Each structure stands twice: as C-alpha cells, then as structure tokens.
Curated annotation (Swiss-Prot):
This is Ferrochelatase. Its main location: cytoplasm. GO terms for cellular component: cytoplasm. One of its GO terms (molecular function) is metal ion binding. Its EC number is 4.98.1.1. GO terms for biological process: heme biosynthetic process. It is found in: Cytoplasm. Fe cation binds at residues 182, 262. SUPFAM superfamilies: Chelatase (SSF53800). It catalyses: heme b + 2 H(+) = protoporphyrin IX + Fe(2+). It comes from Herpetosiphon aurantiacus (strain ATCC 23779 / DSM 785 / 114-95). Catalyzes the ferrous insertion into protoporphyrin IX. It comes from the Bacteria. NCBIfam families: hemH (TIGR00109).
Length: 305
C-alpha cells in the first residue's frame, strides 16, 4: 500500500451538455424519474447559461493547483482526487480509483464551507457506501466544516469590499449586503442540524469584520419537493427591501464556492430580473472558483487534519 494520503475533493456535479440533463436529474432524485416538464424546466435553465456550467472544469483546476501546492510543501505525502455527487467523475468511481492506486487513508473535503447532515453528510455517505460495496477498506477522515477558517472569512470579506466598489461612491453606505446560501428542507431543524447556526455565525463574523451598516441573511435556490424549506427566500427578501425603500443590494452567496447553476441562473438571471422589476440595483461578489488564494485555504484545511 502507498504511504500517501488521498485528498478527495467533492462537489455537487453538473451535466456537460443539454442531452445529459435528464440522467443528471435522475441521479439528483435518487433514481426516480422526473416528469418531462421538470426535465425541460431544468434544461431551459442550462440553455440560459450557455448549455453547461464551469463547475467540473473549475473543480479540476482546483484539484491540480492543490496537488501542486501540497507537493511544494509536503513532497510525496498527498494525492489529490475529485469526485462529484451526481455526475461524472462520480464519487464511488473515484473511491475505486483511490483503492486501485494503493492508497488507504483518505481526507474527504466537500467544496462547501458549512455543515449539514443533508449536504456534507450526503458526501460522506457516498464514500462510506462505495467503501462497503467495493470492499476498498478506505480509512476516511471527513472534514465537516471549514467556515470558521480565518482565510475563508478574509477571502469573502475581500470579495465584498471589491464588489462594493461597483456602486457609486456616494451610495456605498446605502448598499444592503445580502448573504445567501442554499436552502434545505425545514426538517433539518428537527435534527438539530448546525447548518442555520453556522451560516448565521459566519455571516455575522464577516459583517463585523467589515463593519457593514446594513446586512441580512437569506436562503436561495430551494427545491421543488412539496415540503417546507428554510427561509426567508432571497426573492421575497428582495421584495421586502424594495418595500423598505432600499435601492442597492450586494448579494454574497457565501454558501457556494464555485460558479454553477445556482449562481449563473438563480442570481445572475432570475435574481437580477426580479431586482429590475422592483427597481433595485443587484450586484454579487465574484465566487472563489479556482483562485490560488482559495486553493491555499484548502491546503490549510487539509493539512490541519
């Protein structure tokens, strides 16, 4: 067996072409067939952003950069892989590859800063199931949350400062900063899930760092499952801000690290359309994507284990 430790970066996944949307949707739904209307609705969203998102490409770039940064500081100690929850390369296939490469110790790191049993816990379940199904004997150390890392909060704070400069200097103190993260079903509250508290805690910490005069927290991109989801929803919050007489909004989707559909469609198209209807100027921060400073943050998270 190799003495190296595998680092398994994990993300949600995204189809690469429109004709892959249906199978991707089936994967997201745990094997249940979506209706033709649901497939068309999701396909239309992908068409609106150019047919695909850069999530896979960016995750590959982060993987390669993290490998280089780790090799420079810790030669021959780590091998970095990436796997996706709902599209290729699928996490179980990557677990098999890690085993085939003779590596038994794995650090699992989902590319999402805040823990929830549904989100981060779901990634761990995929590794555990693959480990059991393929008898790979992987020893997994899962990093559940890294939102308290000072480097993460500093990166988001810097992105906010950069984005506030998009507004005229005489209105910057009138900008409402709207932190957002992916909504989850309300049933997580019954579990005592830490997700809402982690989100509010990191939003408050970043807002205090910057001494933001007006900031809110909201959820976005809730699913269509027929059950209640965590709120308030960002579109409702935009309407409330307009009713309060606000004019300028900066959205900070700090629950995400990479450009994908929830950013490129839900904010850049749907959110901006709603804001325009309400007479609001809506801007957003640049996501971390494959910024070398973000990769440096991940190196800190990984080597701290």
């Amino acid at each position: 067996m190799s003495a190296k430790t595998a680092v398994l970066l994990m993300a949600y996944g995204t189809p690469n072409r429109i004709d892959e949307v249906e199978q991707y949707y089936i994967n997201v739904r745990g094997g249940r067939m979506p209706t033709p209307e649901q497939v068309e609705n999701l396909s239309a969203r992908y068409r609106a952003v150019g047919g695909h998102t850069p999530l896979t490409t960016l995750t590959k770039s982060v993987t390669d950069q993290l490998q280089a940064q780790l090799d420079a500081e810790f030669p021959d100690q780590y091998q970095v892989y990436f796997g996706m929850k709902y599209w290729h390369p699928l996490i179980p296939d990557v677990v098999k590859q890690i085993h085939a490469d003779g590596i038994s110790k794995v650090i699992g790191l989902a590319l999402a800063p805040h823990y929830s049993k549904i989100s981060i816990g779901g990634y761990q379940k995929q590794v555990d199931r693959a480990n059991e199904e393929f008898n790979t004997n992987i020893e997994l150390t899962m990093i559940n949350s890294w939102q308290e890392q000072p480097k993460f909060r500093n990166l988001i704070a810097n992105r906010i400062s950069e984005a506030l400069a998009q507004f005229p200097a005489d209105v910057r103190d009138q900008v409402t900063v709207l932190f957002s993260a992916h909504s989850l079903p309300q049933r997580v509250l019954a579990w005592g899930d830490p997700y809402p508290d982690e989100l509010l805690g990191s939003a408050k910490g970043i807002a205090e760092m910057l001494e933001l005069p007006d900031w809110r927290f909201t959820y976005q991109s809730q699913g269509e499952t027929g059950e209640p989801w965590l709120g308030p929803d960002v579109l409702d919050t935009l309407a409330e801000l307009a009713a309060e007489g606000k004019k300028y909004v900066l959205q900070v989707p700090f629950g995400f690290v990479c450009d994908h559909l929830e950013i490129l469609y839900d904010i850049d198209i749907e959110g901006k359309h709603k804001a325009n209807e309400l007479g609001l100027q809506l801007e957003r921060i640049r996501l971390l994507n494959d910024d070398p400073a973000f990769v440096d943050l991940l190196k800190t998270v990984v080597t701290g284990q």
